[in-house]
C-alpha cells in the first residue's frame, strides 16, 4: 500500500533532497578546488621530472653521484622528522583506517623523487603523485574542518587529480583511488568528486601542453579461439611476473634492512650497486623511468633480458631508500615482457606489449577496472577483447600479492566470500 501523502512527508522529502543538493554543490566546489591546486602541483612535478631526466640524459656521469643523492634523501627525511615514512601505504591506510597524513609528505616526496631520477635511480613517478595528491588532499580536508569520512574523500580527490595531471589518463585517475584501497569494494561516494578533480587536473595539464601517453598497436589480429588461447597464456605468465616484481620489491627492502642497519649506509650502498650494475649493462636504459624503452617495445624491439633487469634495478633502488613510484617501472616490465613473448611466438609483439602493460599493472595493483580504463586511454579501443581477457586472468591468478602492503583484499578472487586480508 502506498504511503499517504501528508504535509510532514512532503516537507521531509524536500529537506532530504535539499541536503543531497547541498552535498552535491559542496563536492563540486571542493573537487574543482582540489583539481586546480593539486593539478598545478602535479604539473610542476611533471616539468621537474622532465628537467631532471633531460639533465641526466645529457650528463650521464651524474649517476656516479647516486650514493650521495641517497644520503641527501635520508637526511631530508630525518630533518623533517619522517624517518618512518611508508609512502603510498600511508595514503591507503589513511583512507580505510583513518591514519593521519602529514603535509610534509608532499614536499618530501616531490624533492626526493627528483633527486632519485636526477642521479639515475630506477623508479617511477605516479606513486609519488599519489603521495603528493593524498597528502595535500588530506590537508585540505583538515583546513576545511571536514569530518573523518569526508576527509577520506578529499584524499581520494587529491590522488585522482595528481595522477590525472601527471599521467594524462583522467578515466583511470578517477577510478583508481576508489578501487585500489579496498579490493572488492568500490568507494562510490567519492565517484563524482574524483571524476571532477581528475577532469579539472587533466584540463590544466592540456593547457600546459602536457601530452597524454599514447602507443600505437601496429598489428591487431582477429579475435578467435586460437588468439584467445595465446593471450590467456600470456596473461598467466604476466600474473607470475607481477608476483615476482612484488616479491622482489618487498624482499629487497627486507634484505637491505637486515644486513645494513644504518639508513645512510643503506642508501649509499644501494647507489653503489646501481652504479655497478649500470656499468656492467653498458647503458642507462634501466635507470630512471624507462619511458623511452617502452616506446621501443611498440616498435617491436626489446632486449630479451629487459624485463628482468628492470625488476632488479627498481627493487634495488626503492629497497635502498630512494623515492619514486612503481607504476611506470611496471609498464616497462609489462611492455618488455609482452614484446618478448610476441617475438618468440610470432603473435603481434606490439599487441603483446600492450597486453603485458595492462596485465602486469593489474597484477601488481589488483585494480582490473582501472587497468581496463588506462588501457583504453593509452591504446584505444580496438584491442578491447584481448585486453579484457588478459586483465581478467591476471587479476585472478596474481593471487594476493601487491605493491602496497596496506592495500586490503576484501573479497576472495576465487569465491564470493568476504576475506578482508592485506596483500603480501
Regions found by a protein language model. Name each.
Residues 1-424:
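Alpha-helical transmembrane segments and immediately membrane-proximal extracytoplasmic
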Amino acid at each position: 500500500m502506498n504511503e499517504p501523502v501528508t504535509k510532514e512527508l512532503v516537507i521531509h522529502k524536500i529537506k532530504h533532497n535539499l541536503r543531497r543538493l547541498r552535498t552535491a554543490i559542496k563536492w563540486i566546489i571542493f573537487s574543482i578546488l582540489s583539481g586546480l591546486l593539486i593539478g598545478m602541483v602535479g604539473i610542476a612535478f611533471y616539468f621537474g621530472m622532465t628537467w631532471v631526466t633531460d639533465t641526466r640524459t645529457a650528463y650521464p656521469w651524474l649517476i656516479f653521484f647516486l650514493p650521495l643523492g641517497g644520503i641527501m634523501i635520508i637526511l631530508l627525511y630525518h630533518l623533517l622528522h619522517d624517518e618512518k615514512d611508508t609512502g603510498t601505504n600511508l595514503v591507503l591506510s589513511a583512507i580505510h583506517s583513518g591514519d593521519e597524513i602529514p603535509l610534509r609528505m608532499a614536499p618530501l616526496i616531490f624533492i626526493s623523487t627528483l633527486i632519485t631520477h636526477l642521479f639515475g635511480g630506477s623508479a617511477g613517478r605516479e606513486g609519488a603523485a599519489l603521495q603528493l595528491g593524498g597528502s595535500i588532499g588530506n590537508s585540505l580536508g583538515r583546513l576545511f574542518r571536514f569530518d573523518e569520512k569526508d576527509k577520506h574523500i578529499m584524499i581520494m580527490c587529491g590522488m585522482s587529480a595528481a595522477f590525472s595531471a601527471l599521467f594524462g589518463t583522467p578515466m583511470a585517475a578517477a577510478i583508481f583511488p576508489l578501487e585500489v584501497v579496498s579490493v572488492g569494494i568500490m568507494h562510490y561516494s567519492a565517484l563524482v568528486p574524483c571524476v571532477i578533480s581528475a577532469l579539472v587536473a587533466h584540463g590544466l595539464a592540456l593547457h600546459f601542453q602536457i601530452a597524454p601517453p599514447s602507443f600505437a598497436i601496429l598489428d591487431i589480429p582477429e579475435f578467435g579461439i586460437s588468439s584467445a588461447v595465446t593471450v590467456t597464456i600470456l596473461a598467466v605468465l604476466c600474473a607470475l611476473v607481477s608476483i615476482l616484481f612484488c616479491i622482489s620489491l618487498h624482499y629487497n627492502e627486507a634484505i637491505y634492512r637486515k644486513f645494513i642497519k644504518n639508513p645512510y649506509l643503506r642508501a649509499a650502498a644501494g647507489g653503489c650497486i646501481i652504479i655497478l650494475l649500470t656499468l656492467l649493462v653498458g647503458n642507462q636504459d634501466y635507470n630512471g623511468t624507462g619511458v623511452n624503452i617502452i616506446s621501443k617495445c611498440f616498435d617491436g624491439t626489446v632486449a630479451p633480458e629487459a624485463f628482468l633487469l628492470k625488476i632488479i634495478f627498481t627493487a634495488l633502488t626503492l629497497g635502498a631508500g630512494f623515492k619514486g613510484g612503481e607504476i611506470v617501472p611496471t609498464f616497462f616490465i609489462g611492455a618488455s615482457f609482452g614484446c618478448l613473448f610476441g617475438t618468440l611466438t610470432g603473435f603481434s609483439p606490439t599487441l603483446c606489449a600492450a597486453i603485458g602493460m595492462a596485465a602486469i599493472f593489474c597484477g601488481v595493483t589488483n585494480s582490473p577496472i582501472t587497468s581496463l580504463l588506462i588501457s583504453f586511454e593509452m591504446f584505444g579501443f580496438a584491442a578491447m577483447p584481448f585486453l579484457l581477457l588478459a586483465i581478467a586472468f591476471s587479476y585472478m591468478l596474481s593471487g594476493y600479492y601487491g605493491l602496497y602492503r596496506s592495500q586490503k583484499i576484501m573479497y576472495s578472487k576465487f569465491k564470493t566470500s568476504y576475506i578482508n586480508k592485506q596483500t603480501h
